[in-house]
UniProtKB/Swiss-Prot annotation:
Family, per entry: Belongs to the aconitase/IPM isomerase family. LeuC type 1 subfamily.
Descriptive protein name: 3-isopropylmalate dehydratase large subunit
UniProt source species: Sinorhizobium medicae (strain WSM419) (Ensifer medicae)
Free-text function comment from the UniProt entry: Catalyzes the isomerization between 2-isopropylmalate and 3-isopropylmalate, via the formation of 2-isopropylmaleate.
Reaction equation(s) it catalyzes: (2R,3S)-3-isopropylmalate = (2S)-2-isopropylmalate
EC number in record: 4.2.1.33
Listed HAMAP family: LeuC_type1
Highest classification ranks of the organism: Bacteria, Pseudomonadati, Pseudomonadota, Alphaproteobacteria, Hyphomicrobiales
Organism superkingdom: Bacteria
Transmembrane segment boundaries: none
Amino acid sequence: MSAPRTLYDKIWDDHLVDSQADGTCLLYIDRHLVHEVTSPQAFEGLRIAGRKVRAPEKTLAVVDHNVPTSPDRHLGIKNEESRIQVEALARNAADFGVEYYSESDKRQGIVHIVGPEQGFTLPGMTIVCGDSHTSTHGAFGALAHGIGTSEVEHVLATQTLIQKKAKNMLVRVDGQLPPGVTAKDIILAIIGEIGTAGGTGHVIEFAGEAIRSLSMEGRMTVCNMTIEGGARAGLIAPDETTFAYIEDRPRAPKGEAWDMAVEYWKTLHTDEGAHYDRVVVLDAANLPPIVSWGSSPEDVVSVQGVVPNPDEIPDETKRTSKWRALDYMGLKPGTRITDIAIDRVFIGSCTNGRIEDLRAVAKVVEGRKVAPTVSAMIVPGSGLVKEQAEVEGLDKIFREAGFDWREPGCSMCLAMNDDRLKPGERCASTSNRNFEGRQGFKGRTHLLSPAMAAAAAIAGHFVDIREWK
């Protein structure tokens, strides 16, 4: 009888083509997502070598990072470098026979939202993209992670990837979430607990009652930020919630193929007694709404807390780093989080740009107005999310409240397009990274959930969503 295996072990074993004595392995790749920033050199490498894309039907190209989200984006991209990258992806997709969603296609959006929407992302698959937040797709029980541009070329040419197996890590979140606490708070709490290097060298499996209770969109939020916890990938075992989300998606199996797929997907769970190299356990009942205060995703605190004092950190290097973060953020130790005023609000990104996120925002802001000191924008994660939101009338709620309702794209998650912070502006953001300059030169980013960001937009400062009337 074979030894008990984790979910990660099972997917790895199912895709192992070859292994060497030093642990170097060749893995088969089921799905390859491509965007305009990390693919131009990869396609050019194929062109120079006279190679074809080995499996164009397993490759999907989408523009997201550089595209404008303003209503007039049909007039073209102003930034020359961004325009060149977008034009290159369109040309490369056509030349190599890869399906491509341009900014005029309603299926276009952030690549990690588009894949699941289309049923391109399925349980048990290996999925790669030249983007670190590919971990998002792990919510479906898929082994998904980012790769570099040279690896993008390798996968395009061979449909395989060379790598070494990571260690197994389990993060279990027991119990039920209290009202006002969301999937975003779960993952921020996990990163606060383990640190941004806590998952280094591991693939994390998320489990426990609180995780199982999440919708697929909530699970995607959790897995999306696995990389911020230092891990290569994050996984959640598929279940009936997963199957219900996938069924009838355009690229999902149909008929008898569907039944066979579900039968296989039901085997994708960790065996009893399987070994994890590290286990972390959190109690969902103790989790509050969370806000980041520094320039790392591990710099988090309860919304009812205060900015911590770095002098209380024993390690000198870390202490110096946190003082630098406070200086950059323009904050002082002991400041109550709810006393911090904001200038901007960004709701969107591959972390929180889905329809459930927008519904949560609408509940908070309906009948209210954005504070006069705040500029707030909502960017749907895809054209289909935008379409659904407008069918439900959410866009009217947002506009009446004073939010800017945009076209789909990565937007202000990163300063690669027209949406960015000005120096010194403080932003409540539903995105995934609060690094220095991430949202714009000298911009100050605070990470939090969609409902918390929405409430901050109305109040003009951070508020505890649990007390929102």
